[in-house]
Swiss-Prot record:
<keyword id="KW-0227">DNA damage</keyword>
<dbReference type="InterPro" id="IPR011034">
    <property type="entry name" value="Formyl_transferase-like_C_sf"/>
</dbReference>
<dbReference type="Pfam" id="PF02245">
    <property type="entry name" value="Pur_DNA_glyco"/>
</dbReference>
<dbReference type="GO" id="GO:0003905">
    <property type="term" value="F:alkylbase DNA N-glycosylase activity"/>
</dbReference>
<dbReference type="GO" id="GO:0006284">
    <property type="term" value="P:base-excision repair"/>
</dbReference>
<dbReference type="InterPro" id="IPR003180">
    <property type="entry name" value="MPG"/>
</dbReference>
<comment type="similarity">
    <text>Belongs to the DNA glycosylase MPG family.</text>
</comment>
<protein>
    <recommendedName>
        <fullName>Putative 3-methyladenine DNA glycosylase</fullName>
        <ecNumber>3.2.2.-</ecNumber>
    </recommendedName>
</protein>
<dbReference type="InterPro" id="IPR036995">
    <property type="entry name" value="MPG_sf"/>
</dbReference>
<keyword id="KW-0378">Hydrolase</keyword>
<keyword id="KW-0234">DNA repair</keyword>
<dbReference type="GO" id="GO:0003677">
    <property type="term" value="F:DNA binding"/>
</dbReference>
Length: 223
């Protein structure tokens, strides 16, 4: 079954920070993902255009319950940033070695995060190459959430960073992409068929879709 859908985003102009924060504050999962897609992540001299994201909802009794989300079972010290305010960086460690980045969205007290899955390096190529010395193709420098974290050098020290403050160690410049495609999220075992992964189809940095071998269909989960 083909779950992919496509559309056109509204603008390629960098938004005013207050406008962006307000949009993220009011956003639901799909809206938040489309806001973040096409934005530029800035960490030191490295600038990376975000070409693939995934939306994750929140608690099981919240407005957009998502069993694949870190916040589904409630607030913890680890997922605190997901509960707001909007526009902050949620960093977590994956498999004990990779650092993955998310953008918080939604009202304060309501959990939500947009996972940054892949990007194209615009500036700071020498820095990124030094961090990823075994990778020879630029399109692969920041392909996949763990590799994107490695390319930026972000660690748990940046967890909670305010992405739209000028003095933040990690900043996000929002300019929506000219086009997008959506489909199921990668590697999740629950809510696997939700088309909450968004990507820019012409980008060579987008990762390949992989369905989790443990994934259940919507009917199986309800049964």
């Amino acid at each position: 079954m083909n779950y992919a859908t496509a559309g056109v985003a509204a603008s390629t102009v960098v938004e005013n920070r207050d406008v962006t924060i307000e949009r993220l504050h009011r956003a639901e999962p799909v809206d938040a993902a489309r806001i973040v897609l096409g934005s530029t992540l800035v960490v030191g001299d490295v600038r990376i255009r975000i070409v693939e994201v995934e939306a994750y909802g929140g608690e099981k009794d919240g407005p957009w319950p998502d069993p694949a989300s870190h916040s589904y079972r409630g607030r913890t010290p680890r997922n605190e940033v997901m509960f707001g305010p909007a526009g902050h960086l949620y960093v977590y460690r994956s498999y004990g070695m990779h650092f993955c980045m998310n953008v918080s969205y939604g009202p304060v007290g309501v959990a939500g995060g947009v996972l940054l899955r892949a990007g194209e390096v615009l500036d700071g190529c020498a820095t990124v190459q030094a961090r990823r010395p075994r990778v020879t193709r630029p399109a692969e420098w920041a392909r996949g959430p763990g590799n994107l974290g490695s390319a930026t050098g972000v660690t748990l020290a940046e967890n909670g960073a305010a992405l739209f403050e000028s003095d933040s160690p990690v900043r996000l410049e929002v300019a929506e992409s000219d086009g997008w495609v959506s489909g199921p999220r990668v590697g999740v075992s629950t809510a696997a068929d939700r088309p909450w992964r968004f990507w820019i189809p012409e980008s060579p940095a987008v990762s390949a879709y992989r369905r989790s071998p443990r994934a259940m269909s919507a009917d199986e989960q309800m049964g």
